[in-house]
């Protein structure tokens, strides 16, 4: 394979045996594609599909006035350019959004016209562009910047619209009878439920309201009793014979039934005796006897149901749905021959598989007409309102048959039709979709029929947790729904005003108020449950957050109501949702992560890729299947053995079919997994040897990787999985080349690339400039910084990584550090998962992290006057002001400690009334110190660091202070310098290209050159750019290209002028601050944190612990070569946790390090390049796994590769396709180590050998964002609760340590009376006692004088509130 610029610098040895069938898809596509589909900003208005904003506008417009005389039509929408870019929005605390304008057409019609829809009826047309508010834009990395913070909209997994059949599992009724139900769930609108009760009557509910008999709904649809019976039942004709009634012999209806009477042939032979079951043999006998009818006794007809009215001489003898009894049969037999009833029909029902449920329900129904049914429904939906037939009809129609109120959606219609076995053809036609989005009478009847079929034992209920019944609602769809809500509010207001549009001569601008739309959008992005503050700890946490799928949120589940089933792993999760990565705690199973290869289809269902298998042969065709499409397929595992021509070689292949793991012959296999890692998510896919870890620990491992803090120097994992590169690339933290070329210029903050000729656009200078992000604060206060990994003159290609971001090393994710560890107990310092650390780790800054804090000082208008930011602060010494400038703001670079002033601020304070003399003195001497108080911004307690940046924002109209002007000037100078440099680079590039074009060309004149002169590069060296552009070559094509370059440079100059003017306008203009705010100063503090006891660390296998002690290097255990161990872990942490992956990682890490040391030795001894190639070939190509084509690398490449492998050869052991034990041992041997991976260690303090050999190796350890500095604090005195007067709790409130009732019991048990008294009084809520104690300490008297605790007063007040008087009496 061809390696990219960064990949060939350090090749990861892969142990994968299986070929790569498809690359991992772009990891953020679920976010980016969804929002792109919503906005469609890059498509021309006419080419836009009916989705997202387009669909929202189309569904609301046209809006017609009540009279029909005016109409508002939607033409198109377009998005402007955002006022500030992403970086400026974060600094200013504003939203990254673009203004949206909509072209609206107002049509006024002639009031007197008969046909309002004809062209002749149109009186006036007014078209106008209307501002519809700001629409937040998504950044390239799938995030939104809302009020200056990066947020992510998490996708929601909700129940798909459609029809669902279920039962109550026998829990509803005391008898334990299983009651079936059906539910029609629309995308938008009223829910319709049908359910059985214990008596087998069918009921309906609308929107979970009071129950109605299902027959009421059927009658409301306009069906009569006989029509309902015809729809739901088969009929049996009953003929009146000479002696007995007879029925037709229908074999299928008799099979399996118990004979209620003797069935006799015409000859008198008994074929079936009474009480015997009628089987297939007896039916055959009846048919052979030539019988078409069976004689039945009268008793057989008792309790049977009439299928239709019996009418004799226009008189109704019996109504349809009447139960036949003896009386009715006598009445029927009594008629004379002329008027006799020769036949009538009954319903075919039985107790086995043909229940009379609908007939029984009809009999219980008191309504007899459509009108009565509608009024019944109205009473349930609008209790207390007087019903009329018109309003009832209108309500029922609007609930299920009106597209404005009810939307089953395209997905809902597809699910509905599929479930009921009806045809569904997907279409983009908006009119057909709208037509299909409402229910029809047939739909409701079909649902009831299916429910009754299930109750009759035919058909199955649905599995609600099947991923075919749950779909993903991504950011675009949720934004569209919210936008539509806003538009509906606008529609209501517009309809009111439209009627007066003509008389008041209104324009579309006057009619439409965009505030409801803007408010709806703002609410969704700002405060929706699914709009979350982005987890920006490291690149992995960003990617995982964007790929998260939540079952919570609006329209979803709640934590309290969600049961075990919905949280559990379902077999349809395979390849779609990760079975490992989910939070521990109340959200377990409700918040999931997408599997590595999963994507959503057009209906919102999750799909996973499979290779097509035809006749036992695996093809290269890749099919994405949703959980619905997967039903009935037979899927082989990715590691199933395959021959060279692609045939499955095993006689019986291990497959998945209908959610079960079974073995089948190759001919039956239809699909095959694309990769063993398609089951897991990105985070779980980063755990090496995951297959050897217990699932619970793997869950912790994948969650804790997201909490790793980016270290000062990123260090790639020696033992990885090969997924690291994909995460780093797709997370967006690295700088990736947009086009190939040569690195022209590079410094710490910028990379300049001269683009390849082939990738250039005609006429451009062919330069790409990449500006790097330097020392920026993330959402979690970690440091975002990009470092270049290319050098001047390097050749790069499209997609190469030019700069590493936080936690990336040469384009690979690097969350922690490779640390030399030993598994052994050490003096109890690694008891209970504690971690013993060597001082060497601290010295080398291995786990040193930089945290950036943003501290804000706001100067407001108060009632007493304006707050002022100044260096003139009352009662503050010179030393405290030493780091401030004349404007009262700290210098950049100042090192500050807890309590130091960062921004000086004074606030006016209300004073007592001054005497006239004092007023006079104040007027003369201008003494202000007395009327202001110090409210300066200080460094918080337990913090210290370096000021790395200051930003000053001043309200528009308020004069800027000296510091604000200085910042503005430096930013403008820096920007001007950048632009000048940019232009210089472009001009130089243009010079180079002109030189190449003119070299060897004949000229016809220009620039003082004679016609016919042949140009040479040497002659052009000293010519200015203007001179070069004046040259007129003979060849026309060259002349045209010169003209293009000249035009491009002119455009570039104009572009740079415009950019500078725009930047200057933005910087010099005042800032749009909140009401009452005059000035905001933001100070950024960089805090360097070394690892220390109390910090939490973890490996990738859920092996977490807290640093217990940092030992001197000389006391740590060491091996026979004198190499000390960096970390000592407790071996007892492994067996019970069953995460053996960490031991295998340790061994493989040791081999990787040993091989690196061997390479280092070869480089130091200046071994021949041939020997180096041979050794690398042994590592990469002779231990198994993926082969590396070292011959394709030049000698320089090999040297660069070897240089990068000195610290260890990185290994890639992919999930479920990783290194085998034998391969690990072979590598240990190749590195010159024992195959068992153990070493003899010596005690650093005594020099004595430990009794047994110890497992020593390299493990990748992470420092988690649970730092002791953020958690630990101490309180002397501080704030108290207002009511109880007890100290507050928590670091944020500077609170105290709680002394609870159990601790009180402990003191009681010890009889420590004085300590107990102190705890319950002066150290808690005895207000007077603690004041006296303070006085005593000041006076030097060491005694305590306790009083009455305030909580006792609270108790007495509570008792008094119950009406019981309680008084305290002092007795001496």
Swiss-Prot record:
It catalyses: RNA(n) + a ribonucleoside 5'-triphosphate = RNA(n+1) + diphosphate. It comes from the Bacteria. It comes from Psychrobacter arcticus (strain DSM 17307 / VKM B-2377 / 273-4). It is an enzyme of class 2 (transferase). One of its GO terms (biological process) is DNA-templated transcription. SUPFAM superfamilies: beta and beta-prime subunits of DNA dependent RNA-polymerase (SSF64484). Its EC number is 2.7.7.6. One of its GO terms (cellular component) is DNA-directed RNA polymerase complex. Pfam families: RNA_pol_Rpb2_1, RNA_pol_Rpb2_2, RNA_pol_Rpb2_3, RNA_pol_Rpb2_45, RNA_pol_Rpb2_6, RNA_pol_Rpb2_7. Belongs to the RNA polymerase beta chain family. DNA-dependent RNA polymerase catalyzes the transcription of DNA into RNA using the four ribonucleoside triphosphates as substrates. Keywords: DNA-directed RNA polymerase, Nucleotidyltransferase, Transcription, Transferase. The RNAP catalytic core consists of 2 alpha, 1 beta, 1 beta' and 1 omega subunit. When a sigma factor is associated with the core the holoenzyme is formed, which can initiate transcription. The keyword Transcription applies. HAMAP family: RNApol_bact_RpoB (MF_01321). This is DNA-directed RNA polymerase subunit beta. The keyword Transferase applies. CDD domains: RNA_pol_B_RPB2. One of its GO terms (molecular function) is ribonucleoside binding.
């Amino acid at each position: 394979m061809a390696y990219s610029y960064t990949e060939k610098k350090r090749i990861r040895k892969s142990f994968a045996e299986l070929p790569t069938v498809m690359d991992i898809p772009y990891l953020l596509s679920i976010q980016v594609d969804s929002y792109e589909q919503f906005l469609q900003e890059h498509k021309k208005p006419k080419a836009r599909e009916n989705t997202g904003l387009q669909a929202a506008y189309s569904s609301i417009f046209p809006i017609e006035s009540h009279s029909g005389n005016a109409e508002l039509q939607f033409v198109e929408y377009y998005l402007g350019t955002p006022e500030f870019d992403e970086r400026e929005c974060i600094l200013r605390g504003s939203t990254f959004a673009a203004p949206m304008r909509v072209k609206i057409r107002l049509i006024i019609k002639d009031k007197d016209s008969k046909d309002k829809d004809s062209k002749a009826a149109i009186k006036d047309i007014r078209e106008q562009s209307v501002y519809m508010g700001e629409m937040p834009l998504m950044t390239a990395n799938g995030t939104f910047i809302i009020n200056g913070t990066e947020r992510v909209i998490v996708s929601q997994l909700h129940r798909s619209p459609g029809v669902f059949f279920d039962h109550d599992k026998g829990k509803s009724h005391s008898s334990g009878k299983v009651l079936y139900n059906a539910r029609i769930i629309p995308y938008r609108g009223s829910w319709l439920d049908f359910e059985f009760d214990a008596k087998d009557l069918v009921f309906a509910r609308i929107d979970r309201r009071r129950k109605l008999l299902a027959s009421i709904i059927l009658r409301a649809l306009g069906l009569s009793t006989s029509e309902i019976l015809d729809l739901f039942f088969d009929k049996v004709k009953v003929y009146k014979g000479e002696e007995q009634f007879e029925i037709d012999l229908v074999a299928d209806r008799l099979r399996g039934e118990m004979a209620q009477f003797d069935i006799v042939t015409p000859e008198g032979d008994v074929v079936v005796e009474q009480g015997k079951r009628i089987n297939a043999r007896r039916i055959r006998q009846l048919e052979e006897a030539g019988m078409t009818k069976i004689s039945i006794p009268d008793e057989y007809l008792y309790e049977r149901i009439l299928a239709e009215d019996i009418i004799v001489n226009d008189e109704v003898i019996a109504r349809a749905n009447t139960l036949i009894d003896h009386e009715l049969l006598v009445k029927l037999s009594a008629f004379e021959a002329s008027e006799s009833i020769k036949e009538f029909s009954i319903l075919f029902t039985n107790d086995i598989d043909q229940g009379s449920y609908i007939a029984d329900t009809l009999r219980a129904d008191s309504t007899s007409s459509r009108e009565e049914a509608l009024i019944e429904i109205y009473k349930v939906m609008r209790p207390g309102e007087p019903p009329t037939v018109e309003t009832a009809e209108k309500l029922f129609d609007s609930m299920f048959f009106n597209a404005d109120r009810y939307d089953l959606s395209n997905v809902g219609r597809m699910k509905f039709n599929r479930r009921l076995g009806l045809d569904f053809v997907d279409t983009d036609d908006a009119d057909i979709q709208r037509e299909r989005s409402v229910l029809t009478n047939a739909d409701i009847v079909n649902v009831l029929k299916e429910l009754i079929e299930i109750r009759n034992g035919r058909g199955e209920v649905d599995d609600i947790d099947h991923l075919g019944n749950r779909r993903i609602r991504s950011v675009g769809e949720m934004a569209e729904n919210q936008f539509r809500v806003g538009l509906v509010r606008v529609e209501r207001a517009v309809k009111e005003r439209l009627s007066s549009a003509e008389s008041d001569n209104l324009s579309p601008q006057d009619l439409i108020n965009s505030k409801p739309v803007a408010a709806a959008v703002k609410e969704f992005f700002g405060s929706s449950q699914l709009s979350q503050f982005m987890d920006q700890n490291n690149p992995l946490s960003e990617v995982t957050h964007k790929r998260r799928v939540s079952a919570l949120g609006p329209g979803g589940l709640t934590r309290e109501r969600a049961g075990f089933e919905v949280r559990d792993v379902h077999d349809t999760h395979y390849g779609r949702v990760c079975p490992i990565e989910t939070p521990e705690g109340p959200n377990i199973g409700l918040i999931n992560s997408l599997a590595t290869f999963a994507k959503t289809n057009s209906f919102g269902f999750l799909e996973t890729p499979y290779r097509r298998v035809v006749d036992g042969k695996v093809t290269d065709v890749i099919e994405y299947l949703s959980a619905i499409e997967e039903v009935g397929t037979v899927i082989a595992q990715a590691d199933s053995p395959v021959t060279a021509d692609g045939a499955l070689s095993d006689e019986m292949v291990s497959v998945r079919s209908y959610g079960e793991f079974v073995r089948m012959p190759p001919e039956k296999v239809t699909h095959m997994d694309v990769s063993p890692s398609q089951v897991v998510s990105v985070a779980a896919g980063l755990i090496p040897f995951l297959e050897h870890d217990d699932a619970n620990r793997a869950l912790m491992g994948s969650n804790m990787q997201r909490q790793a803090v980016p270290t000062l120097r990123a260090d790639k994992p020696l033992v990885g999985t090969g997924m690291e590169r994909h995460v780093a690339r797709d997370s967006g933290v690295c700088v990736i080349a947009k086009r190939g070329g040569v690195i022209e210029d590079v410094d710490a903050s910028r990379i300049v690339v001269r683009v390849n000729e082939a990738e250039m656009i005609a006429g451009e200078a062919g330069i790409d400039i990449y500006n790097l992000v330097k020392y920026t604060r993330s959402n979690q206060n970690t440091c975002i910084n990009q470092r270049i990994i290319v050098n001047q003159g390097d050749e790069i290609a499209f997609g190469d990584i030019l700069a590493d971001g936080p936690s990336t090393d040469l384009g690979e994710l690097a969350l922690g550090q490779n640390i030399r560890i030993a598994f052994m107990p050490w003096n109890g310092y690694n008891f209970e998962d504690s971690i013993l650390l060597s001082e060497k780790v601290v010295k080398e800054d291995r786990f040193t992290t930089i945290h950036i804090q943003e501290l804000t000082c706001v100067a407001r208008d108060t009632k007493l006057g304006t707050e002022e930011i100044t260096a003139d602060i009352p009662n503050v010494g010179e030393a405290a002001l030493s780091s401030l400038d004349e404007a009262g703001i700290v210098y950049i670079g100042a090192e500050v400690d807890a309590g130091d002033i960062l921004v000086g601020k004074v606030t006016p304070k209300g004073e007592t009334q001054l005497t006239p003399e004092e007023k006079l003195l104040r007027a003369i001497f201008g003494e202000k110190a007395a009327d202001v108080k110090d409210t300066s911004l200080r460094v918080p307690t337990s913090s210290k660091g370096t000021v790395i940046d200051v930003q000053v924002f001043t309200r528009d109209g308020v004069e800027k202070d000296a510091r604000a002007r200085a910042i503005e000037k430096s930013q403008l100078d820096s920007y001007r310098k950048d632009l000048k440099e940019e232009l210089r680079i472009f001009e130089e590039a243009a010079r180079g290209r002109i030189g190449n074009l003119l070299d060897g060309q004949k000229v016809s004149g220009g620039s003082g050159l004679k016609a016919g002169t042949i140009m040479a590069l040497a002659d052009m060296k000293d010519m200015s750019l203007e001179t070069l552009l004046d040259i007129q070559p003979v060849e026309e094509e060259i002349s045209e290209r010169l003209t293009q370059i000249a035009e491009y440079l002119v455009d570039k100059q104009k572009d740079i002028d415009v950019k500078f003017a725009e930047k200057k306008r933005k910087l010099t203009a005042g800032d749009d601050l909140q009401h009452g705010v005059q000035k905001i100063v933001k100070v950024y503090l960089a805090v360097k944190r070394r690892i220390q006891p109390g910090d939490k660390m973890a490996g990738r296998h859920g092996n977490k612990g807290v640093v217990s002690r940092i030992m001197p290097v000389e006391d740590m255990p060491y091996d026979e070569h004198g190499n000390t161990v960096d970390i000592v872990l407790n071996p007892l942490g492994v067996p019970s946790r069953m995460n053996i992956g960490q031991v295998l990682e340790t061994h493989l890490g040791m081999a990787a390090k040993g091989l690196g040391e061997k390479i280092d030795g070869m480089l130091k001894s200046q071994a021949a390049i041939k020997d180096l190639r041979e050794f690398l070939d042994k590592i990469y190509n002779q231990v198994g796994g993926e082969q590396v084509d070292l011959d394709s690398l030049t000698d320089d490449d090999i040297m660069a590769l070897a240089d990068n492998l000195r610290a260890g050869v990185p290994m890639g052991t992919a999930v479920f396709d990783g290194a085998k034990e034998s391969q690990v041992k072979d590598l240990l041997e190749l590195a010159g180590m024992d195959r068992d991976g153990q070493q003899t260690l010596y005690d650093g303090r005594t020099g004595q050998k430990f009794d047994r050999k110890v497992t020593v190796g390299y493990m990748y350890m992470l420092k988690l964002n649970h730092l002791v500095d953020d958690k630990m604090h101490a309180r002397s005195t501080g704030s108290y609760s207002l009511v109880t007067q007890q100290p507050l709790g928590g670091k944020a409130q500077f609170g105290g340590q709680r002394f609870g009732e159990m601790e009180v019991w402990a003191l009681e048990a010890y009889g420590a009376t004085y300590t107990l008294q102190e705890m319950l009084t002066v150290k808690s809520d005895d207000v007077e006692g603690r004041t006296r104690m303070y006085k005593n300490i000041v006076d030097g008297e060491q005694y305590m004088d306790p009083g009455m605790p305030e909580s006792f007063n609270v108790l007495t007040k509570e008792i008094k509130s119950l009406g019981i008087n309680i008084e305290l009496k002092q007795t001496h």
